[in-house]
Regions:
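Extended assembly/interaction regions that build large supramolecular complexes
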Residues: 407-427
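Extended charged low-complexity segments that act as oligomerization/scaffolding linkers
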Residues: 13, 49-54, 514, 519-555
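Short, flexible loop/turn elements at secondary-structure junctions
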Residues: 9-10, 490-492
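Active-site-adjacent bridging/hinge elements
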Residues: 1, 14, 20-22, 433-441, ...
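Repeat-mediated protein-protein interaction surfaces in helical alpha-solenoids
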Residues: 442, 446, 476-481
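Extended amphipathic alpha-helical scaffold segments
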Residues: 22-411, 449, 453-473, 482-487, ...
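Extended repeat-based interaction scaffolds and adjacent low-complexity, acidic/S/T/P-biased segments
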Residues: 425-452, 462
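Short capping/hinge segments at domain boundaries that bridge a core fold to an adjacent linker or tail
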Residues: 2-27, 41
Length: 555
């Protein structure tokens, strides 16, 4: 029968009283910023300084300048914390907007990073996954402290005109957190405050990135937050975010306004280039030398037209990373499943198909984009696994389209140097009909294959399909409709392989929807050989790089 507090208000108050005695001596109290016991008291001091005048400024502004000049970075952080935590934060922030946005937004960026930390708290407490993993979970998975957000968000939204055209990962992080950690509506059905406005700001920032990359700006570091933030607003701005995602996935013409902004910059650059050629002899000489360099012959390659399900051109790698690795596409899956399926296929299939003559490949080119994180094969690595749970019908149709596409590519490669029919698996159904699924033992082995790093996204997707079907069986659900769809619309022996594993998981299905599998006995011979080799599918070296917890989970 006791109450335990995780703070010590009395001690914080006592320390604050001491700090008020030395508030004018910034270097003296700044040395205490490295001691966590003094953090709360120093934040109170910062709020106290906001209300003390020193000639034309407040003591807070003076202290910030002194702390910055003397390289007391922790003291600067504490003062920024005080600004965010103050009951009158919106007014104080607005009064200092020029300070925050000046000097290349140094203080603005730091303020947003500090705010994100103090306005959130770990949501993974008590997992006990190991010291390093616990720290990672605490940093990555956080829930918001709701009361601390409204003043800062009102300030950001009020300054949206001044922030237009700026690109800030710190701002994107704040926006993404609010959009992902709050519901769309409140209990009475009213719209959650700030969601739509922040989604518009995130999308405007993403459009600026699109313009900058369109006229040649290169981002030297990966910035997935600039893409996941607008994706998180897919439910708030379904049309606008959907169109933007289709553009970046190469499935829609670039927005007319974006084209105009890119052309405007290009015209200005061309003018500057022409003027510099006239007045700068050294610049002109360098330009002429570059013009005389012959184009590289390179290897003999034939570029193919874009695949019907793929992108129409080069896809932004940061957008692909944000969607696949950072799970940003899940926002589209919830808001617009059909559009998400189209984008997912475009990101999975290679965006610039080509064939290199004279080269020898150890694996068949299935027309997929190389995805480093899809090796070794595991169902949870595929975006189709959550897609199948969020929007089963749309996800299954998209997955079927992917498997059929890859199988068609396999057949085209195999039949390039042979004649006759494509080898396959012929099944007989209860109504007397027959159907041949392309591929023999190699294609049959795709769902549990680890022999290709380039085609890992396909293998993980097939593994995700198998896992989803077995989970539904475990939950007592009927999968007859899904099995019928796979038989009816699929063209690949890889899908038959998945269903063989499902039949092994629930043998009673062989007397019902999976009875057709018994009409091709070789399937079970191939499966027996696959089981004998299954021990080699665990790639210990690769899993060990992800840490002990992931190694044990994969094993």
């Amino acid at each position: 029968n006791r109450i335990e507090f995780e703070h010590d208000l009395a001690a914080d108050w006592a320390r604050f009283q001491f700090l008020k005695q030395i508030w004018a001596d910034t270097p003296k109290w700044a040395t205490l910023a490295g001691n966590p016991l003094w953090t709360n008291a120093l934040r109170m001091l910062g709020q106290f300084l906001l209300r003390q005048r020193v000639e034309a400024e407040t003591a807070w502004d003076v202290a910030l300048g002194v702390a910055g000049a003397t390289n007391h970075e922790l003291a600067v952080d504490i003062l920024l914390d005080a600004l965010c935590l103050d009951p009158d934060a919106e007014r104080f922030l607005t009064e200092r907007v020029d300070l925050l946005l000046g000097n290349e937004e140094k203080h603005f960026t730091r303020l947003l990073l500090r705010f994100h930390h103090i306005a959130t708290m770990p949501s993974s407490a008590g997992l006990r996954l190991g010291t390093a993993l616990d720290l990672y979970m605490e940093a990555q998975y956080r829930s918001i402290v709701f009361g601390r957000w409204p003043p800062v968000l009102r300030f950001l939204i009020a300054q949206r005109e001044r922030l237009a055209g700026r690109v800030s990962s710190a701002l994107a992080k704040v926006i993404e957190t609010w959009l992902t950690k709050t519901p769309q509506t409140l209990g009475a059905g009213d719209r959650m405050p700030f969601r739509r406005e922040l989604a518009e700001m995130a999308l405007a920032m993403a459009r600026t990135v699109q313009v900058e990359k369109g006229h040649g700006v290169m981002y030297l570091t990966r910035e997935p937050l600039l893409y996941t933030a607008p994706l998180a607003g897919a439910a708030d701005l379904p049309t606008e975010v959907g169109n933007w995602a289709l553009e970046l996935a190469g499935r829609r013409e670039v927005d007319a306004e974006v084209k105009r902004r890119i052309a405007e910059v290009q015209v200005q650059k061309a003018k500057e280039h022409a003027e510099r050629l006239k007045v700068d002899a050294e610049y002109k000489a360098r330009h002429e030398r570059r013009e005389r360099i012959p184009a590289s012959l390179g290897s003999f390659r034939e570029r193919f037209p874009p695949w019907p399900l793929g992108a129409s051109g080069k896809v932004d790698m940061d957008f692909r990373t944000a969607c696949i690795k950072e799970n940003g596409i899940q926002f589209l899956m919830r808001a617009q499943p059909a559009l998400a399926g189209e984008v997912l296929l475009a990101l999975t299939i290679e965006d610039q198909p080509e064939r290199e003559y004279g080269s020898s490949r150890l694996e068949v080119d299935l027309g997929l984009e190389y995805t480093r994180d899809a090796y070794p094969t595991a169902f949870w690595k595929s975006p189709f696994f959550p897609f199948l749970q969020l929007a089963p019908e749309t996800a299954l149709a998209s997955l079927l389209a992917l498997v059929n596409f890859c199988t068609d590519r396999w057949a085209a490669e195999v039949m390039r140097e042979r004649t006759g029919e494509v080898p396959g698996v012929t099944l007989q159904f209860a109504d007397g009909s027959q159907k041949t699924f392309m591929g023999r033992r190699q294609v049959f082995g795709w769902p549990q294959s680890n022999d290709s790093m380039r085609n890992g996204s396909l293998f993980c997707s097939l593994d995700a399909l198998e896992r989803w079907l077995t989970q539904r069986l475990d939950s007592g659900e009927d999968i007859s409709a899904e099995v019928e769809k796979l038989f009816r619309e699929g063209n690949s022996a890889a899908l038959v392989s998945v269903l063989v594993n499902v039949a092994k998981f629930r043998p009673s299905l062989l007397t019902g929807p999976l009875a057709a599998l018994l009409t091709f006995p070789n399937l079970f011979q191939w499966d027996s050989a696959r089981v004998e080799q299954i021990g080699y599918n665990f790639i210990a070296l690769s899993w060990s790089r992800d840490g002990q917890a992931m190694f044990d989970f994969a094993r």
